[in-house]
Amino acid sequence: MAERIECAVIGAGVVGLAVARRLAMSGREVVVLEAEEAFGTHASSRNSEVIHAGIYYPTGSLKARLCVAGRLALYRYCAEHDVRHHRIGKVIVACDETELAGLGKYLEQATINGVEGLRMLTTRELEELEPEVRCVAGFLSPATGIIDSHGLMLAYLGDAESHGAALALASPVVSGRVEDDGIVLEVGGAEPMSIKCGMVVNSTGFNAQAVARSIAGIPPQSVPPTHYAIGHYYTLSGAAPFRRLIYPVARQDWLGVHVTIDLGGRVKFGPDLAWIDRVDYRFDESREAAFYHAIRRYYPGLKDGALQPGYTGIRPKIHGPGQPAPDFVIQDQRDHGVAGLVNLYGIESPGLTSSLAVADHVAALLEVASSRREGSVP
């Protein structure tokens, strides 16, 4: 017989933990089911660790709204919970005249999205702020920052557990089924179990589609396609030549190889983008020459041999090569017909920045579902 649990959050990445925290703090009984033996082992720990301002995303999109709201909430949260972070700022640069129009579009979109403090920089200001950067124009985003993503997840988990949530590691959801009075999840691992949940949040990153397909009663047509995109990061040996993050104008279907700086002062370049057909974190060192070429467009002082292989990360894409990047997909009963179920698809960047706002959004959807079930909403 299945054990009854009010709410299960599947996936203990940064978004899943934020959702679990939010639900537990609202008084719900929450269990977090994580397939791996630790939390946050995939996209949540294999990224740039950037707090994004909300510059690039289309007007009115979930990415735009949740990134801006999430950033403001995240800075407050970090200050209140002593999560290491630094509002370091970012300079977006046009490397030549052909990129000026793109730079202008970024600035216009960011202004529409409500990003504060943006400022076009004169050539002299650019030289003073970042003397090692070569460009023809740029603007400053002072709201952009960097963060200790592991520390953030620890804080979210601590909040959730202090409000009664439980984290079950090495507990993969292997199948499930929709019943009239809830959703039954079959959980594997060393001690398999069945749990019946009134609410389920599927926040499993690039596994979200597989989890959804494993639950009988979720319409297959509601599940978007799965695509994997790997990104490589190289680190820079020696002292940091930059004081801020440096992002070139994108020339392809991602933001390009940019400069990030971690809280220890280490400079990282990346990510690039390569489409793969399965999850494989191996580092492809043959991409080194392309990195040197891309970086020297805005940092001509990069010396041969200065780049060292860093790490890779895989983004949970719901679009393929040559297709426009879609919005976050956050589905509830209106999309798939299952009461109490929220599926999160394609929660890549700016997912970390947006995590608190995503959690609020999911909680609101579940509150509506709960009210409908109780008959208070027609």
Q: What do the PLM-derived regions correspond to, one by one?
A:
Residues 2, 26, 45, 325-378:
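C-terminal lid/capping helical subdomain adjacent to the catalytic/cofactor pocket in oxidative enzymes
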Residues 5-32:
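N-terminal Rossmann-like FAD-binding beta1-loop-alpha1 element of flavoenzymes
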Residues 22, 51, 82-86, 193-199, ...:
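Active-site substrate-recognition segment that forms the wall
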Residues 24-46:
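Glycine-rich FAD pyrophosphate-binding loop
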Residues 49-125, 135, 256:
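Dinucleotide-binding Rossmann-like beta1-alpha1 core, especially the glycine-rich loop
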Residues 56, 144-146, 251-254, 342-355:
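Glycine-rich phosphate/pyrophosphate-binding beta-alpha loops
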Residues 58-69, 93-102, 139-158, 168, ...:
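Short beta-strand to alpha-helix junction loop
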Residues 139-199, 356:
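Helical element adjacent to the flavin cofactor pocket in flavoenzyme catalytic cores
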